[in-house]
Amino acid sequence: MSQEKYIMAIDQGTTSSRAIIFNQKGEKVSSSQKEFPQIFPHAGWVEHNANQIWNSVQSVIAGAFIESSIKPSQIEAIGITNQRETTVIWDKKTGVPIYNAIVWQSRQTAPIAEQLKQDGHTKMIHEKTGLVIDAYFSATKIRWILDHVPGAQERAEKGELLFGTIDTWLVWKLTDGAVHVTDYSNAARTMLYNIKDLTWDDEILELLNIPKDMLPEVKSNSEIYGKTAAFHFYGGEVPISGMAGDQQAALFGQLAFEPGMVKNTYGTGSFIIMNTGDEMQLSSNNLLTTIGYGINGKVHYALEGSIFIAGSAIQWLRDGLKMIETSPESEQFALASTSDDEVYVVPAFTGLGAPYWDSNARGSVFGLTRGTSKEDFVKATLQSIAYQVRDVIDTMQVDSGIDIQQLRVDGGAAMNNMLMQFQADILGIDIARAKNLETTALGAAFLAGLAVGYWEDMDALKELNATGQLFKASMNESRKEKLYKGWKRAVKATQVFTQEEDADDDAK
């Protein structure tokens, strides 16, 4: 067998871990996936067992080798991408976590976040970290664990405990405890990292009483952090040389290297990230400012908008309403709709994300008539995804002053041609669907490969994930704006409905 060299990407997600082996053309050669248990101790709490995450990663590494007959010695480098914000604290000597990993979705630390807001720290934290104060980010999760595990604060102050997001935990495990690092993109999601000065922020650490010794060293997204311990990589001592949080890895995998380039991943929710270049731009409109990636001594900042419900709206049609049997079927139903009636579905099942950040909003439907069909309802649900993306894109253009020309897309719902065409129409710009939709893992592989010379430079990557299909806007301007104004009215009415409910409760 030829000793061709490859890059392995470890993609550690919220519900499963994957290992994917890529060749020099950026093609997937082998992959393995393993789910792991979700832990829900109380309503709104979401936790993982960090050792189960590690076990799942070991399993998929083996699986990728078994499927392909590729040997560990053929792996030139490893890239890691991960669910962001999820927090692990472990014993420095034994490597044993002192509590479950608190997952990014978990709301158990919301009271800590609310207290920070009430104490007037919103502006300071926003200006330093680019983030809003929220339980979403790692800072409140660290504080919660130190508060709730007996003796944890004292042990942390003695230097006996280490903190890490999942990237840090995996590197620490793969190197058998030799390396305690994170990267710019993951550090930027902790709410402890000053993204302007590129340092852990002493004022925020003091405010939350988090000992600095717990924190990992912050590195660029593409450099050799360490090598795998041979017994953790089937005899191979392989450089770990690329790391990025999942959405930033997708930005890199989409080759969005220039300011103004934007990608959207249509997953359960939708995550829209714009490369804003080397200038940190704080949003005035509820978008997050973060670090896209740092490479070759230069940091690229980004604006991010999160939409809570995208692909999960299609799952709702399938599992909740039983209107469709499979998710891909939604496209055929939508195309069969012959009505021009303006039906709007506002899928605020868990509130509205960017740019509204209205956690009280709930789902609603407007514009139904006796003539409304199942096909019309399915079409309106798909269109709601595109309308929400426009909400964020319009806001990004205002915040950045950049006129967006193209949206690069990936994720499961990006395979829906009807949705992609409507997305192009309602935005009035081109939609470029990646040829390789594995953009998150590919981004981690690219970062790792660049650090070891597997790919020469970023220009060499541009041929490796070309546009698979381009969707061009074809709707006339007046129709486009009429539809979008209807959407804005529907969102406003949805918010008013829950506001009036709150007012009724207050009156009681």
Curated annotation (Swiss-Prot):
Question: What Enzyme Commission number(s) appear in the record?
Answer: 2.7.1.30
Q: What are the entry keywords?
A: ATP-binding, Glycerol metabolism, Kinase, Nucleotide-binding, Phosphoprotein, Transferase
Modification after translation is described as: The phosphoenolpyruvate-dependent sugar phosphotransferase system (PTS), including enzyme I, and histidine-containing protein (HPr) are required for the phosphorylation, which leads to the activation of the enzyme.
One Gene Ontology cellular component = cytosol
Q: Which reaction does it catalyse?
A: glycerol + ATP = sn-glycerol 3-phosphate + ADP + H(+)
Class of the enzyme per the UniProt entry, highest EC level: transferase
| Any one Gene Ontology molecular-function term assigned to this protein's record | glycerol kinase activity
Activity control mechanisms: Activated by phosphorylation and inhibited by fructose 1,6-bisphosphate (FBP).
Residues that, per the record, bind ADP: 14, 18, 268, 311, 412, 416
> The organism sits in which domain of life?
Bacteria
Where Phosphohistidine occurs, the residues are: 232
Q: In which pathway does it act?
A: Polyol metabolism; glycerol degradation via glycerol kinase pathway; sn-glycerol 3-phosphate from glycerol: step 1/1
Positions bound to ATP = 14-16, 268, 311, 315, 412
Q: Please verify whether the record's keywords include Nucleotide-binding.
A: yes
Which residues are involved in binding glycerol?
A: 84-85, 136, 246-247
Q: What does this protein do?
A: Key enzyme in the regulation of glycerol uptake and metabolism. Catalyzes the phosphorylation of glycerol to yield sn-glycerol 3-phosphate.
Matches recorded under NCBIfam families: glycerol_kin (TIGR01311), PRK00047.1 (NF000756)
Question: How is the subunit organization of this protein annotated in UniProt?
Answer: Homotetramer and homodimer (in equilibrium).
Q: What is this protein called?
A: Glycerol kinase
Task: Identify the gene encoding this protein.
Answer: glpK
